[in-house]
């Protein structure tokens, strides 16, 4: 994020009723913010509202990870940049990934202790490995902001702190 993020009037509605807000939020570049609260307090709703407002400036790790079970971890991570390439490039990457893409994804997965799972189908991953694959996808997006909704809930202590 190059400039401070200023959001005013964030409100969430469910069934026509306001369930959150209106809220104002100011975030400076480099800030790390954690939302803490009881179940049902609106944390996930607030994250979705922020993501809807900032769009492509943010990478999102949702609670529902959105992994494609039939595809290997590489392709699930690579999906973060699909819109940066044309359809032919993406199709070629599905068949035989380019070296630069393989190296970039492998580097991120290495940071997440997942290098050995590069070509494993997402369906064969444990819950914690699935979360790390989704985190890898968000990091590969290389957006100015990272929004994560319970991103380490299935990770053990040492991995969660990493």
Whereabouts are the PLM-identified features?
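Conserved structural motif at the start of ABC-family nucleotide-binding domains
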Residues: 5-7, 19-22
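Q-loop/switch helix immediately C-terminal to the Walker
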Residues: 64, 71-92
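Conserved ABC ATPase "signature" region
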Residues: 90-117
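Conserved ABC ATPase signature
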Residues: 121-125, 129
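Hydrophobic anchor residue at the start of the ABC signature
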Residues: 135
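Catalytic Walker B motif of ABC-type/P-loop ATPase nucleotide-binding domains
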Residues: 146-150
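Helix N-cap at the start of a conserved alpha-helix in ABC-type nucleotide-binding domains
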Residues: 157-159
């Amino acid at each position: 994020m190059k400039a401070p993020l200023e959001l005013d009037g964030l409100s969430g509605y469910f069934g026509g009723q306001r369930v959150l807000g209106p809220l104002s939020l100011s975030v400076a570049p480099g800030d790390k913010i954690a939302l803490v609260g009881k179940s049902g307090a609106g944390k996930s709703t607030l994250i979705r509202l922020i993501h809807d407002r900032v769009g492509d400036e943010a990478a999102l790790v949702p609670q529902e990870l959105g992994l494609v079970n039939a595809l290997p971890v590489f392709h699930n991570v690579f999906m973060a940049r699909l819109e940066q390439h044309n359809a032919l490039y993406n199709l070629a990457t599905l068949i035989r990934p380019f070296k630069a893409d393989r190296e970039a994804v492998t580097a991120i997965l290495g940071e997440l202790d997942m290098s050995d799972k590069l070509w494993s189908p997402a369906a064969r991953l444990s819950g914690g490995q699935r979360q790390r694959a989704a985190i890898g996808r968000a990091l590969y997006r290389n957006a100015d902001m990272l929004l994560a909704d319970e991103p380490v809930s299935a990770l053990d202590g040492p991995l969660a702190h990493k």
